UniProtKB/Swiss-Prot annotation:
Positions annotated to bind [4Fe-4S] cluster: 19, 106, 205
Reactions performed catalytically: isopentenyl diphosphate + 2 oxidized [2Fe-2S]-[ferredoxin] + H2O = (2E)-4-hydroxy-3-methylbut-2-enyl diphosphate + 2 reduced [2Fe-2S]-[ferredoxin] + 2 H(+); dimethylallyl diphosphate + 2 oxidized [2Fe-2S]-[ferredoxin] + H2O = (2E)-4-hydroxy-3-methylbut-2-enyl diphosphate + 2 reduced [2Fe-2S]-[ferredoxin] + 2 H(+)
Active-site residues (renumbered): 136
Record keywords: 4Fe-4S, Iron, Iron-sulfur, Isoprene biosynthesis, Metal-binding, Oxidoreductase
Binding site for (2E)-4-hydroxy-3-methylbut-2-enyl diphosphate: 48, 84, 134, 175, 233-235, 278
Source organism phylogeny: Bacteria, Pseudomonadati, Pseudomonadota, Alphaproteobacteria, Hyphomicrobiales
CDD domains reported for this sequence: lytB_ispH (cd13944)
Name of the protein in its database record: 4-hydroxy-3-methylbut-2-enyl diphosphate reductase
BP GO terms, sorted: dimethylallyl diphosphate biosynthetic process; isopentenyl diphosphate biosynthetic process, methylerythritol 4-phosphate pathway; terpenoid biosynthetic process
Function: Catalyzes the conversion of 1-hydroxy-2-methyl-2-(E)-butenyl 4-diphosphate (HMBPP) into a mixture of isopentenyl diphosphate (IPP) and dimethylallyl diphosphate (DMAPP). Acts in the terminal step of the DOXP/MEP pathway for isoprenoid precursor biosynthesis.
Gene name per UniProt: ispH
GO MF terms held by the record: 4 iron, 4 sulfur cluster binding; 4-hydroxy-3-methylbut-2-enyl diphosphate reductase activity; metal ion binding
Binding site for isopentenyl diphosphate: 48, 84, 134, 233-235, 278
Amino acid sequence: MTDQRPSLEIRLCGPRGFCAGVDRAIQIVVLALKKYGAPVYVRHEIVHNRYVVEGLQSRGAIFVEELHEIPAEHRDQPVVFSAHGVPKSVPADAEAKNLFYLDATCPLVSKVHKQAMRHQRLGRHVILIGHSGHPEVIGTMGQLPDGAVTLIETVEDARSCHFDDENNLGFVTQTTLSVDDTAGIIEELQARFPNLSAPAAESICYATTNRQDAVRSAAPGCDLFLIVGAPNSSNSKRLVEVAEKAGARMSMLVQRAADIEWDRIGDISVVGLSAGASAPEIIVDEIIDAFKARFNVKIELAETTVETENFLVNREIRDVELTVQDMAFVNGEHRVVGIPKLMPKIIQGK
């Protein structure tokens, strides 16, 4: 019987999905649960993805907004800080409450914290390029005293900002920003403040840059570009913007296959597909399956680089072994209930 489904090319971007920092953060919660038992408390979403959060909840993690929400009878259980980083006041509060905590801050976010503190130590007022209210921005600003950091969100902000000492300024950036948009803000700041000091190393992380490069490469000629990610995921929203600017006719952010607006899509022959750094691979598979149910799909890999970065987990939990099923869950390849769909792609101790 002839296949009557229309043909569709899916350009599957690589790299996509979980980065080393997200892998590490999820591992920390899983390892803590295995070593200390449930419940393990997590301050804020460990990463911006409900699928991951719900999977960890099913294993015994309890998510809270602030430390005072942890019941007195559970104060001997560990609490994990999210991958986005926290202000200095949070670990200080944990110590005051005699809580045992594990910091899952991405090492690349911690690097930005150190860059900001170095600027201040050298007598510079710190300019932070980022999005107001994002947990990473709150964490970075919370490394320094009130008034020591000015947040710049747009080129317009860069044009209108003023400082008491324009010769002693240094900037850092949120790690998940659009590379192109950030370049425009930095260019404007450098034009206005020629003595502006840059960080010793790039603030935007390798995973953000790599995912944007892959989307930029795949987008021209796409009728539709889907980005798997949460609405509160900064790096995922930037990928939607990159796809549109790079030539995709339409770009959408979806959390699950059920979010795809089939009626809005219309006639399509080429679809781009990528995932933000906190989106699990199993949802990418789910979306491909949804297209296969409607189209005769041909998948083309649009890979621009291969990532090999690995980050160690906290010393306190390195003695715990993960099973194959644990590792598949950490990699986003494992449904909350059931057996692993794919073999793991990480090494324990990463």
